[in-house]
Amino acid sequence: MAYKIRLGGTNEFVSAIDPHAPHCYPPGEVKFVEGWSNPAAIIFLTKTSAERAKDKVWEIEGFHTTIEEML
């Protein structure tokens, strides 16, 4: 099973997580792309890695996200 992280209630998915982005204050940046089938969205191969990334998105941006199973 593979997983994507979706911005709560939207069709936007995490495409990049940079916890050290220097141009942001506080440091850190999360980027999103639109579309369930967008190839730029990050695909996590384990639920554990998706959960860690979800926690990092919360830590950086404070956004509510969900982990979506990809069939």
Residue ranges with predicted function:
Residues 1-40, 67:
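Short aromatic-glycine-(Arg/Gly/Cys) micro-motifs in beta-strand/loop hairpins
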Residues 38-71:
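Short, mixed-charge low-complexity intrinsically disordered segments
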